[in-house]
Amino acid sequence: MRTKNVCTFQLILFPKVRSYIPLPLILKRIEITKNCISTRGETTKTSVTEKLSEEKTVVVEPVFGFLKAHFHSTRFSEEATKRRKRKWALLVVILRKYTARNSKQKRTKKTRQKGVRSSFIDERTPFSFIFWLVLFRPLFNVLPCSAQSLFVQEFFITSPCLVCPAFPLEQNVSAFAPSTNGTKTKQMITITPMIRFIVVQLLTLRFSYRTVKGISPLRRRAWFFLWFNRSKCFCVGSIHKRNKNKADKQYQTEYSFHCCSTPIIFILVR
């Protein structure tokens, strides 16, 4: 049984450790640290740890206490959760890096002006993909009806989602709006992602029932799930402040509006 003195020493020195450390060992550890300070480096840290590891007796809880005592962390500890989060974040970065198109090759930098933040012009267009899709569309007519129902519908559903870039087009809307102090300040009209999300959903539902005619209910459900999740990817935008002039107190905001061109591909092809 643990005595009161041992419990108090353990709470003071090691509040998070679930192991039994006897009182003489705690006192010896304090003496060793005092000697280490008094002798000014004559006894090194390695010798101190060796002495402690030889005489330490650990009584731990089963399974998780053993893991915590010997490996210093379990799956449910704080260090392990941080490690898992870092792994998932790295996986997301890798997937986004290798699924999107190479932005360095497809984007050109604007000429820098005085007081203007350097931005990018997005030159990625889906016309090459539309041309490829229209060119090879008659090849699928050779397949029988069963093969077409199995492969062609999934091909036309998934291929634009995978091949087309996430943000194919960009559009900036600007206007003059009065500010609070009465002076006219040029600023961009901010279009909220929710409005864009509704527009994408309407474009999707406009031709969805005609496209999924003859598909099984399970496959139709998967079709809608894929489309609705894909449309959420287009609802990513940000407002950037730029041209901040303290003398004129003018704040020009820019909003990048990324249009969804994937439903347009379906309308043109189908």
Swiss-Prot record:
EC number(s) recorded for this UniProt protein = 3.1.21.4
Task: Name the domain of life this protein comes from.
Answer: Bacteria
Keywords of the record = Endonuclease, Hydrolase, Nuclease, Restriction system
Q: Which reactions fall under this protein's catalytic activity?
A: Endonucleolytic cleavage of DNA to give specific double-stranded fragments with terminal 5'-phosphates
Which Gene Ontology molecular-function terms are recorded?
type II site-specific deoxyribonuclease activity
Signal peptide as annotated in the record? none
A biological process from GO:
DNA restriction-modification system
The record describes the protein's role as: A P subtype restriction enzyme that recognizes the double-stranded sequence 5'-GATATC-3' and cleaves after T-3.
Q: What is this protein called?
A: Type II restriction enzyme CeqI
Q: Which organism is it from?
A: Rhodococcus hoagii
